[in-house]
Regions:
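Residues at alpha-helix termini
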Residues: 107, 120, 131-132, 154-155, ...
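PAPS-dependent sulfotransferases, especially Golgi type II membrane carbohydrate sulfotransferases
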Residues: 1-53, 176-179, 185, 209-217, ...
Length: 319
């Protein structure tokens, strides 16, 4: 017969559990106090968390163009692809499966490692951009690291964010061109490899954009959603609207000059075209660039995102 615990033993276990929880709450409170003290001590001498503007997106969505326009403005500095978000990639780390206390990102120690992520970003920024003042803005262009966007925004909730999106079919078409023989990424591939690359590119897009959207939806601070297609149609108007949503005041004349300087029309012709980094900049160009097989593959993988952000674009699957 299994022995049953008496009421005294059960009471002691419950009391011990309460003590452990109280101790954990005390540790978290102390950690938050240290974090606040740390931020207070660095205030006025480095980049302020609320002056960080993240650009979360996927590759080939126009983030280089956007960040260069923003970088032209007074008091703006661009941190070009630090990949810090890749360090907390939920897919690679299997965050939904690893629950043990010994796991470095265990939920039991969330406050501890969020503080570490925060310090990594702020200290890394201060070390790289010591000339950037407390009133200046740091634009962090983070396409590859967008997979870690939710945790980055949780660690730095005061920061602002731009969610940059582009039709995934155009994104895949751009990557397909980049990997052709003689192109700027110089990779030769046959028809089978081309189909597989489309599948991988679409899956990568879903991971990065999906996590960026998750961060955008959860963020309660200043944020802006920018579509690449809107930038191409009216870059100045889109930039004005986005800065207003971000709560950042900029000089309209300076902004207009930045937009003009980095317009598609002002890129030298020899730097544009197929096989070049600046390839096409034509929304909907995927209709000419992708094979029917590639289109079907991509539209199947990205269907929910297409439905939400490009509902006017009817999938070509089966047609």
């Amino acid at each position: 017969m299994p022995r049953t615990r008496g009421p005294n033993a059960a009471s002691r276990e419950l009391e011990e559990a309460h003590e452990r929880l109280a101790k954990k709450d005390e540790e978290i409170g102390q950690l938050r106090a240290r974090l606040a003290q740390r931020d207070a001590s660095r205030r006025g001498s480095g980049i302020e968390p609320e002056n960080i503007v993240w650009i979360f997106c996927s590759g080939r969505t126009g983030s280089s163009w956007l960040s260069r326009m923003m970088g032209e403005l007074e008091g703006h500095t661009v941190w070009f692809e630090p990949w810090v978000g890749a360090l907390v990639d939920p897919y690679h780390l299997q965050l939904d499966r690893r629950k043990g206390a010994h796991f470095i990102l265990s939920s039991q120690y969330r406050a501890t490692w969020l503080a570490s992520i925060r310090s990594l970003v702020l200290d890394g920024a201060d070390a790289r951009f010591p000339e950037t003042g407390s009133k200046d803005y740091l634009i962090i262009k983070e396409p590859g690291g967008s997979v870690g966007a939710p945790l980055l925004m949780e660690a730095l909730p005061e920061s602002r964010m731009i969610f940059l999106i582009r039709d995934p079919r155009d994104v895949v078409a751009s990557w397909a061109d980049a990997h052709k023989k003689g192109s700027w990424l110089s990779a030769d591939e046959g028809p089978e490899a081309s189909a597989e690359r489309a599948r991988r590119a679409a899956s990568r897009y879903v991971r990065n954009i999906g996590q960026a959207k998750r961060a955008y939806d959860a963020h309660r601070g200043r944020k802006a959603l920018i579509k690449y297609e809107d930038l191409r149609e009216d870059a100045l108007g889109t930039m004005k609207r986005s800065y207003s949503q971000l709560g950042v005041t900029v000089d309209e004349g300076e902004l207009s000059r930045a937009v003009e300087k980095h317009s598609w029309e002002n890129i030298p012709e020899e730097d544009k075209g197929e096989g070049k980094f600046y390839r096409k900049a034509t929304p909907g160009g995927w209709r000419e660039d992708l094979t029917p097989e590639q289109v079907e593959i991509v539209e199947h993988i990205v269907a929910p995102l297409l439905k939400e952000f490009y509902p006017e674009s009817q999938p070509n699957v089966g047609g």
